């Protein structure tokens, strides 16, 4: 009897994997997304969504990637949103000097409150700023990270140039985002989440489907980095997302 439990269990897993990976990748034309969050209701809804399990797992993955580079010095979280990631970094890597940067003052209020609630407000600061004109001196940042922000960048080449400018020599950047050429199965799942699961305020702005549709492909990102004169870029693609990392040489 145990044999058949294992057999059908393994068979079920194989069928699910075939369904997921058997679907071809989508070839959508990119649609632009909003650059920042000005609506308090949308900001609050985004804050709630970041507490869902997939986002918690994502933050763990980013921090594990971050630990691989022996992080030290000043770290900027570009597009820090409501501060979940930067606060967790403060808890896991307390030696870093942390700065959260976001274009939306509305969402930063949630980040500041989270830092206070976690008693981490002394370990970080938050700034309102544009990714294309960051409020930092040239060659002043050791590490720059960004999670689910790339697809909001209107001029990604200019942002990558700015990243290169503010990083110190041998400074590192690590960027995580969706990839628009995700498999059709994932598009179906995100469409379901957008229409059924998320708070009403996010349904109105068609999120998170809008973020997926406005994301870039790995090939496009490589082209942006090349136009920004960035070298030694590594893109690690996954089912529906990608990690982009590099150093300033």
What are these model-derived regions, one by one?
Residues 74, 171-172:
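Short glycine-centered segments of the SAM/dcSAM-binding site in methyltransferase folds
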Residues 132-143:
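A short acidic, Gly/Pro-enriched loop at the edge of an enzyme's catalytic core
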Residues 76, 82-133:
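Class I SAM-dependent methyltransferase SAM/SAH-binding core
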Residues 154-158, 183:
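Short N-terminal helix/helix-N-cap motif within the alpha/beta-hydrolase-1
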Residues 143-155:
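A short SAM/SAH-binding and catalytic strip from SAM-dependent methyltransferases
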Residues 25-30, 85, 176-244:
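C-terminal alpha-helical "lid/dimerization" subdomain adjacent to the S-adenosyl-L-methionine
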Residues 157-169:
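A short glycine-rich, Lys/Arg-flanked "PGG" loop and its adjoining helix->strand segment in the class I
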Residues 6-70:
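Conserved class I S-adenosyl-L-methionine
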């Amino acid at each position: 009897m145990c044999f058949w439990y294992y057999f059908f269990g393994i068979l079920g897993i194989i069928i699910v994997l075939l369904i997921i990976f058997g679907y071809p990748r989508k070839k959508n034309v990119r649609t632009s997304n909003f650059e920042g969050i000005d609506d308090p209701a949308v900001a609050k809804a985004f804050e709630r969504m970041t507490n869902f399990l997939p986002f918690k797992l994502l933050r763990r993955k980013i921090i594990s990637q971050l630990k691989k580079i022996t992080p030290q010095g000043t770290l900027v979280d570009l597009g820090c949103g409501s501060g979940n990631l930067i606060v967790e970094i403060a808890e896991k890597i307390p030696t870093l000097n942390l700065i959260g940067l976001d274009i939306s003052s509305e969402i930063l209020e949630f980040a500041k409150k989270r830092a206070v609630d976690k008693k981490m407000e002394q370990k970080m600061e938050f700034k309102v700023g544009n990714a294309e004109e960051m409020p930092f001196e040239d060659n002043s940042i050791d590490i720059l990270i960004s999670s689910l922000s790339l697809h909001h960048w209107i001029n990604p080449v200019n942002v990558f140039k700015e990243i290169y400018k503010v990083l110190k020599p041998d400074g590192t950047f690590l960027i995580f985002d969706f990839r628009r050429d995700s498999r059709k199965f994932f598009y179906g799942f995100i469409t379901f989440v957008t229409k059924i699961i998320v708070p009403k305020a996010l349904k109105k702005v068609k999120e998170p489907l809008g973020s997926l549709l406005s994301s870039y492909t790995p090939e496009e990102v490589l082209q942006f980095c090349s136009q920004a004169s960035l070298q030694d870029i590594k893109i690690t693609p996954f089912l529906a997302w990608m990690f982009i990392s590099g150093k300033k040489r």
